[in-house]
Structure formats: C-alpha cells, structure tokens
Amino acid sequence: MRYLCRPLNAGLVDVLAPYRIPFVGLKPGRHVYRMEVDPLFFASFPQSEIHSARGVAEIVLEKIGSTLDAVVVLDAVVTLPCDRCLADAELPIHFEDRVIAHTGAAVTDLDGEVLQLGPEVYELDLAQPIFEAAHFALPTRRVHAAEEDCDPDVAGYLA
C-alpha cells in the first residue's frame, strides 16, 4: 500500500524523550538522574531566548506512595545575545527548582505548585521545568564578562 503522506513524526527523533522519567513500577525511595542539556534541547522550544547551552540537570526524585518529589539542579553555560553588542555571549547559570506531583487523579495544576497526574500518565516530563529553570537563572543584564570581548564595530557606535 502506498501513502500520499508520511504519518506524523515518522522518522523524527523525540529529542525530549530523555527528560521523561517513567514512574510506574519505580520503587519507593530516592532515585538520582543526570540529564545532559545541549543545543538540541533548547532548539525544541521555539520561544527560547537561549541560542545554545552545554550543561547538566541533576534530578533527585523521591517517590513516597503516590507522591513524586523531584529536586532539579541545573548547571550550564548558555549562549545568548549580549545586551551591549548583540554578539553571542557565554554565561554560566545555576538554578534549583522543586517539582511535586501526585499520581492517580485527573490532570490539573493546583496553584502552580503540585501537579496531579491522571491514571493514564506513566512518566514525569521534566523538559518544561528544566527549560523554565534555565530561563529563571538568566541574569537581568546579559553582557560579556569583559567589555573588550564585545564586538568592536558595535562598541565603536556606543562610544
């Protein structure tokens, strides 16, 4: 049989799959995960201000009954436009966040603090919390560490 178009996502790799933790069948207790944060990760979010990044998100997941308590620690070096010259600047970031989820109920977001995961959900998707952590960690002033690292052509206009 011949198809006129390919099925959705045919041949595409799910770049965000490594950021999902299956919790069904996971034993109670503490579990540690290490997730690489790379340029492909941020390319998956079209609204991202970050051009590129290299780093690690360490997740400490505590499963207690039907509760999942995840602490996300992100350490990375991100590339984004310098506020002074618009050339790419590399900036180190660090951020810690906590994600709490309860399983077994309808999917809702309670006060933005606790996620309720329905019975059909079998994995905790941490891609969005990691993405948000990276953006929360960005400094308000995004410039090269040394002014002489700025693009000299643009710096000439500012002088």
State what each model feature region is.
Residues 2-159:
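Acidic and generally charged, gly/proline-rich low-complexity regions
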